[in-house]
Swiss-Prot record:
Record field: catalytic activity: tRNA(n+1) + phosphate = tRNA(n) + a ribonucleoside 5'-diphosphate
GO molecular function, one term: tRNA binding
Protein name: Ribonuclease PH
Described purpose of this protein according to its UniProt entry: Phosphorolytic 3'-5' exoribonuclease that plays an important role in tRNA 3'-end maturation. Removes nucleotide residues following the 3'-CCA terminus of tRNAs; can also add nucleotides to the ends of RNA molecules by using nucleoside diphosphates as substrates, but this may not be physiologically important. Probably plays a role in initiation of 16S rRNA degradation (leading to ribosome degradation) during starvation.
Length: 243
């Protein structure tokens, strides 16, 4: 696919930013990753907690949950820490719930046993697509954490049933494009976030028109772009885990 209106980055319409997944990025967490989508950089850690929420007590199954945050100067201007304000924004709550839903879609929580896998996604630099980068990186961190559980004999098998990754797509300059950076995201006509499994199943589709409604044909084109992009992200996840 080509784009008659050049992207600010010079990328093709169907081209991801440079994606890097660096495992074992921090020392203490059972799984840790630095994931980079171009200039967007997120540290994702996976921590094993040997207890479950009260609503799962005595059921014998596990739980997976996520938290998301941004450093004060992850963006162009400084923002106060949410802890200093004493309240999470609606955006933060929405994103961390999305990350949790995305990962739970590919986890057999019964196989995890009575413990919680806690994912923390901290944005150290934001240039668009922080939630999609967080999901993609958090999966790799979670994979490393459960691999350690299996190796330690705490669980009999991996609870992971498939890969999961996420990407943004949108209509920019009148054409569908893949993996929006900040310049594109702030000026696009349509913005959509797509979460899919390695097998091609949809976990979540979030799409919004920014003043100019999009057609069914445009939506189909966006989903096709997203599916191809997520296929490439899954390939990169596999390569990182096999390294």
């Amino acid at each position: 696919m080509t784009n008659s209106s050049p992207r600010p980055s010079g990328r093709r319409a169907d081209q991801l930013r440079d994606v890097r997944i660096t495992r074992h990025y921090t020392k203490h967490a059972e799984g840790s990753v630095l994931v980079e989508f171009g200039e967007t950089k997120v540290i994702c850690t996976a921590s094993v907690v040997e207890r479950v929420p009260e609503f799962l007590r005595e059921r014998g199954q596990g739980w997976l949950t996520a938290e998301y945050g941004m450093l004060p100067r992850a963006t162009h201007t400084r923002s106060d820490r949410e802890a200093a304000r004493g309240k999470q924004t609606g955006r933060t709550q929405e994103i961390q719930r999305l990350i949790g839903r995305a990962l739970r879609a590919v986890f057999d929580l019964n196989a995890l046993g009575p413990r919680t896998l806690h994912l923390d996604c901290d944005v150290i630099q934001a240039d668009g697509g922080t939630r999609t980068a967080s999901i993609t990186g958090a999966f790799v961190a979670a994979h490393d954490a459960v691999t350690k559980l299996v190796a330690a004999g705490k669980i009999a098998r991996s609870p992971i049933t498939d890969y999961v990754a996420a990407i943004s797509v949108g209509v920019f300059g009148g054409a569908p494009v893949l993996d929006l950076d900040y310049d594109e995201d702030s000026a696009c006509d349509t913005d959509m976030n797509v979460v899919m499994t390695g097998a091609g199943g949809f976990v979540e589709v979030q799409g919004t028109a920014e003043g100019v409604p999009f057609s069914r044909a445009e939506m189909n084109a966006l989903l096709d772009l997203a599916q191809a992009g997520i296929g490439e992200l899954v390939r990169l996840q596999r390569a990182a885990l096999e390294a």
